[in-house]
């Protein structure tokens, strides 16, 4: 009846709030916590029952319906499964439930897709097509450091050490790390900074006054337009990161060092690049040997 449902919802929401606070204390970032919250609230909304009453069948059915309705990818469904798993495992640890209903739901096999990288030629074409000294510096910095675009836009002039050819970036979850750039990037960055007339501390600013710090969307748009002009498929900042990782593994860089360079919290994330290399080998074998 309505009253019981209302009581269930109140106690479910209370437990969710405690869980999200625990995640915050563990150091999860605000966007992650919001994603956890909205994902779990969806379950409460579609299957309103007491936390202790959820069964493995309920969760399986929910995931199946969700996938069908939203035509979701396996990766999305596995992310939702992981969030449910984290929530119910926490409830079990804190003795709110006897056993997590997600425990018997296995990881969704996602099948590693071989995602595209930029060829050396692509990167040279992009460099050659730059009409603005700033854009050349952006491409060089992305290509040689493999940093995230969200890290790039936060950089200030002071974060760059030209002598050491390195800079400090603030990664996901406010973690600082050092990244390194090559001689070509150093020269192009210096040229760009020398050409600037503004006093903004930001490393990259808009081309026109009032010379505001560039935003992620601005950099993405710029790269996409350059790619279109050159007929290079889907040029976006993350592709430079993926390219650097793939090249590093190709050349035999130890996976732990690559993890540090890319700022991955979990080595699984870095290992995906190594696995992709492996599937490239498989594709090549099928193509040439059968």
Q: In which residue ranges do the predicted regions lie?
A:
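Conserved tyrosine-mediated DNA breakage-rejoining catalytic core shared by Y-recombinases
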Residues: 145, 150, 154-191
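Basic, Lys/Arg- and aromatic-enriched nucleic-acid-binding interface segment
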Residues: 97, 112, 120-149, 173-175
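Short pre-functional
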Residues: 41, 85, 136-150, 166-167, ...
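Alpha-helix N-cap/helix-start motif at helix boundaries, enriched for small hydrophobics
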Residues: 33, 84, 138-139, 146, ...
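C-terminal catalytic core of tyrosine-transesterase DNA break-rejoin enzymes
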Residues: 140, 144, 241-265
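Active-site/catalytic core of tyrosine-dependent DNA strand-transfer enzymes
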Residues: 182-232
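N-terminal core-binding DNA-recognition domain of tyrosine recombinases/integrases
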Residues: 2-6, 14-114
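Catalytic-site neighborhood detector that most strongly recognizes the C-terminal catalytic loop/helix
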Residues: 117, 172-173, 262, 266-287
């Amino acid at each position: 009846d309505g009253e019981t449902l209302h009581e269930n919802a109140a106690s479910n929401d209370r437990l969710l709030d405690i869980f999200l606070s625990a995640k915050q204390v563990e150091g999860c970032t605000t966007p992650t916590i919001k994603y956890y919250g909205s994902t779990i609230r969806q379950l409460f909304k579609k299957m309103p029952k007491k936390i202790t009453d959820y069964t493995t069948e309920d969760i399986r059915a929910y995931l199946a319906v969700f996938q069908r309705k939203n035509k979701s990818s396996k990766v999305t469904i596995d992310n939702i499964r992981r969030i449910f798993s984290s929530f119910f495992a926490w409830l079990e640890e804190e003795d709110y439930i006897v056993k997590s209903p997600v425990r018997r739901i296995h990881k969704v096999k996602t099948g590693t897709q071989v995602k595209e990288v930029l060829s050396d030629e692509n990167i040279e074409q992009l460099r050659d097509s730059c009409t603005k000294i700033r854009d050349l510096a952006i491409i060089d910095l992305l290509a040689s450091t493999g940093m995230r675009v969200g890290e790039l836009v936060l950089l200030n002039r002071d974060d760059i050490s030209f002598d050491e050819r390195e800079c400090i970036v603030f990664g996901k979850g406010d973690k600082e790390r050092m990244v390194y750039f090559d001689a070509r990037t150093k020269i192009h960055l210096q040229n760009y900074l020398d050409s600037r007339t503004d006093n903004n501390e930001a490393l990259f600013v808009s081309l026109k006054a009032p010379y505001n710090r560039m935003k992620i969307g601005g950099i993405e748009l710029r790269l996409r337009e350059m790619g279109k002009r050159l007929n290079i498929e889907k040029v976006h900042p993350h592709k430079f990161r993926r390219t650097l990782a793939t090249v590093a593994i190709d050349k035999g860089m130890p996976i732990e060092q690559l993890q540090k360079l890319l700022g991955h919290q979990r080595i699984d994330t870095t290992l995906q690049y190594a696995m992709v290399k492996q599937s490239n080998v498989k594709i090549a074998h099928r193509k040439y040997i059968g």
